[in-house]
Structure formats: C-alpha cells, structure tokens
From Swiss-Prot:
This is Small ribosomal subunit protein bS6. Pfam families: Ribosomal_S6. Residues 107-149 have a biased composition (Basic and acidic residues). The gene is rpsF. CDD domains: bS6. Keywords: Ribonucleoprotein, Ribosomal protein, RNA-binding, rRNA-binding. The keyword Ribonucleoprotein applies.
C-alpha cells in the first residue's frame, strides 16, 4: 500500500465538531477499502489567499493515509461531492512525518529564521562615496548632442 498526505479545507461556516465528523467520515471510507489512517491534525480556521466558492476562510485538516489507490480515489470522489469541502489535495510520500507538522509547531519552535535582533543591519549595503561616477543631480549630467543638419530621421 502507498503512503499519502491528504489536506482538505472545509467551509468557514461549519463548526469544528462538524469538521471532525467529516474527517471521521472520510477516514471510515479509507478503512472500509482496506487502508489505515495515521495521524490527523486539525489546523484550525485560517484565511484563504483568495475567495474559494465565496469563502474567505476555511478549516484546514491534515490526514496521513496508508491505503491502496482505489481507497484514496473513492475518498476524493466523496469529497468532490460534499458541499462542505472547498478544496483538497492528496500527495504521495515516501514516509510519514512522526513529529507534528510545521503548521502545528509554534512560531518560535520552527527555527526557520535567524536572529533578527541587533547587529549591523545595513552593513552589507554600504554605498561609500560616489567616486568618479559623476554628479548625483539629474540636471548636471551631460546631454547627448543632436546634429543640427539632421531632419529628424525623415528623408
């Protein structure tokens, strides 16, 4: 059997309990088809990048699945029919993550940014003096000369 990570977004006007019931309903489809459902994470009500079916927010849920392709296809078919599911994506993975996903970790625990305090913030952007590049004023620049004998490109 193959390993999958499945994320779906439920409508903003359903409650968290209804989202958990949807998750259980789709998990039962996988189990009936001979698959197993591993970790399930409810990520909460989050803003969408753009409106999806007239919704600006959605309940995000991650489900780790170990099931044959037919079971995943049936679950996706049922999600497509459901009015409560806005979007979903299923990705095949080599192995499931055992630790909480990045969405469940607190911002400080992720460690994806370096120390942002102190230091020489603009040290790498030192412009120095202008050197021999000329004046900094636009009006002081030398303008190209036009040949007075030209007729503006017309023959």
């Amino acid at each position: 059997m193959a390993l999958y990570e499945h994320i779906f977004i439920a409508r903003q006007d359903v409650s968290q309990q209804q989202v958990e019931a949807l998750t259980e309903q789709f998990s039962n489809i996988i189990k009936e088809q001979g698959g197993q459902v591993g970790k399930t994470e409810y990520w909460g009500l989050r803003n969408l990048a753009f409106k999806v079916k007239k919704n600006r927010k959605g309940h995000y849920t991650l489900v780790n699945i170990d099931a044959p392709h037919a079971a995943v296809a049936e679950m996706e078919r049922q999600m497509g029919i459901s009015e409560d599911v806005l979007r979903f994506i299923t990705v095949r993975v080599e192995e499931h993550e055992t630790e909480p996903s990045a969405m469940m970790q607190s911002r400080g625990d992720r460690g994806d940014r370096g120390d942002r305090r102190g230091g020489d913030r603009f040290g790498d952007r030192d412009r120095g003096d202008r050197g021999d590049r000329g004046s900094s004023r636009f009006g002081d620049r030398e303008r190209p000369r036009r040949d007075d004998n030209s007729d503006g490109g017309q023959e």
